[in-house]
Amino acid sequence: MKRHTRKIAIIGTGLVGSSCAYSIVNQGICEELLLIDINHERAVGEAMDLSHCINFTNTRTKVYAGSYEDCKDMDIVIITAGPAPKPGQSRLDTLGASAKIMESVVGGVMESGFDGIFLLASNPVDIITYQVWKLSGLPRNRVIGTGTSLDSSRLRTILSEMLHVDPRSIHGYSLGEHGDSQMVAWSHVTVGGKPILQILEEQKERFGEIDLDEIVEKTAKAGWEIYKRKGTTYYGIGNSLAYIANSIFNDDHRVIAVSAILDGEYGEYDICTGVPAIITRDGIREIVELNLTEDEESRFAKSNDILRDYMKTIGY
């Protein structure tokens, strides 16, 4: 019986791309891992280094460096290429440079005959995901950004430290921009199935007055707190990429907050933003529409309006 070989390409072997590759190899997510970088020798070096660590894992992944032409048979192409924000910049400030890079990258990949799923981490990820969808001509379910997946993880971590509960027992999502304007759908955050708003109300003596906006800001600024201390972030986003890729290959039907192109969901059209979505082997099977409160709807719409204003600067 012929078995399909799972194949992933990573474009951009900087800290994010190499961290993603390391997660993929350690977890045995695919059988073939192609690395592509504008500095080909760097990609070769990363492939060699990763190949040398495989004997210490329970997996057997073929890792090699190549070019866009090799993307033809890939199931997933992960793009991490792009400039890192400089001190004082937001992710949105890198848009112009990132957009130019995507024109070259997507053109090269599509010329190979690629017909799989794009998975994006390049910032600003929501707008870049939209651009890649437009440039590639692929169906919207097969162009996915990491969106607020990492933000949602950071939110759960912050809440777990506050509540002294395992973060895996906390469910909730950051929505909107992967950036400063993101919001949290507090009406849908639960701890062991119990609404967090109810918990905070019932246990005021224990927790005191909790400023929810402060938690949202702490979540949104978490990346910058890391940046101030070590210069950049890569483990969290690298593992997020690997997690989404694994969910695709395993047809998990797992709900993950990703950058998705909306076409009527949440009353929004022609925009890519962070929302919970069901991830399957075909990419996004369905966008999960949370029943937001009036205040949450307003905050979500405001975040999307900010994204739209920046989209106009690159012609969308």
UniProtKB/Swiss-Prot annotation:
Q: Which Pfam families match?
A: Ldh_1_C, Ldh_1_N
- This protein's superkingdom? Bacteria
Cellular component aspect of the GO annotation: cytoplasm
Q: Which UniProt keywords apply?
A: Allosteric enzyme, Cytoplasm, NAD, Oxidoreductase
Q: What is its EC number?
A: 1.1.1.27
Pathway(s) of this molecule: Fermentation; pyruvate fermentation to lactate; (S)-lactate from pyruvate: step 1/1
| Activity modulation notes | Allosterically activated by fructose 1,6-bisphosphate (FBP).
Which residues does the annotation say bind beta-D-fructose 1,6-bisphosphate?
Answer: 156, 171
Q: Which GO terms describe its biological process?
A: glycolytic process; lactate metabolic process
Task: Name the residues annotated as catalytic in the UniProt entry.
Answer: 178
Q: Which InterPro entries match?
A: L-lactate/malate_DH, L-lactate_DH, L-lactate_DH_AS, Lactate/malate_DH_C, Lactate/malate_DH_N, Lactate_DH/Glyco_Ohase_4_C, NAD(P)-bd_dom_sf
Q: Where in the cell is it found?
A: Cytoplasm
Q: Which GO terms describe its molecular function?
A: L-lactate dehydrogenase activity
According to its UniProt record, which reaction does this protein catalyse?
(S)-lactate + NAD(+) = pyruvate + NADH + H(+)
Q: Which residues bind NAD(+)?
A: 16, 37, 42, 68, 104, 121-123, 146
Q: Which annotated residues bind substrate?
A: 91, 123-126, 151-154, 233
Which HAMAP family does the record match to this protein? Lactate_dehydrog (MF_00488)
- Annotated family: Belongs to the LDH/MDH superfamily. LDH family.
Q: What biological function has been recorded for the protein in this entry?
A: Catalyzes the conversion of lactate to pyruvate.
> Which proteins does it associate with, and in what oligomeric form?
Homotetramer.
> What is the name of this protein?
L-lactate dehydrogenase 3
- Organism equals Bacillus cereus (strain ZK / E33L)
